[in-house]
Amino acid sequence: MTIPKKIWFLWYQGLSEAPLVVKKCYESWQQYNPDWEVIFLDENNLTDYITPALPKEKLCQLSKTLQSDLIRVELLSKYGGVWADATSLCRVPLDGWLEEYTQAGLFAFIYKTRSHGWIFSWFLATEQSNPIIVKMQLTFVAFFRDNEFYHNGRIAKKRIAFLKLFLNRKYKTTKFWSSWIVRKIFKVYPYFIFHFIFANVINSDKELLKLYKTMKPYYNTGDMLGKYGLLRPLTAEIKERIDSRIDPVYKLSWKYKQENYSPSCILYYLLEE
C-alpha cells in the first residue's frame, strides 16, 4: 500500500518554544527523510489542515494528550501519511523499512500480541482514507461528543480506580471501558482510552479485523531505552544497540531533570552524538 510521504509532527507552543528533545526529534525526521514533507503543526496553523470534529466546548475539556489523539486520527483519515509524536526520534529512513509493514494500508507498533488489537499510538502510518483509521476517527470523536464525563478531579480518580479493579484484569475486559454503563453511569474513562477504543474498533468488525491481520507485525522496540532510564549511564551494550540502528524509531521524553543530563547518559548520546 502507498503511504503518502507526509510526516505530521505536533507541538502546540511552536518550535521556538519546544524543549531540546522535541527540537532534536523534529530535526531527525527531516534529516533521515529528505524526500518526505515534514509538517510541523502548532496551535497557529493546525486549522489550515483540519477543522476539529468536536465542538469547541467539548474539545477544551480534554487534556492536550487526548486532543493530540483526536488530531492524529483526523489528519491521517483525511490525508494519510505518518504521525510521529513530538518525542519520537527517527533513526532509520522510512523508505528503508516502512513499506514492508503496510500491507493493510496502516502500520503501528504492536503491543505484546497482535490478536488483541492493542497498538502504540506514538507512531502511526496510514494510507489516505484507510477504513480502519476512518472508523477509529468516527468512533473516537463520537465517544467524547455524545457523552458527558468527569474529565478530572477526585470523583473521576476514585471511579477510575474502582473500575480498574475489574476492567483491567484481562485484555478482554478492557473493552467495557467504552460500554454504556461506564459512559453514562460512571461517566469516566482511563488514560489509555484511545488504545482500548482502537482494539474495540478492530474486534467488533470482521472486515476491519481481517484487514488489520494483514498488517505485518512489528513488536515495539522503540521504547526499549525507557526501561533502562534515559538518564542512566551509557553502557557498551546500549551503545552497541543504538549504533546498530536495529530500532527505526525511539520513543523519548522531554520531562527529565536537567541536572542529570550529561555526556555520559543515554539521552545525551542519542541527541548530541
Q: Model-flagged regions — what are they?
A:
Residues M1-S68, A84-E273:
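Glycosyltransferase-associated regions of secretory-pathway enzymes
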Residues D69-G81:
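Small-residue hinge/turn detector
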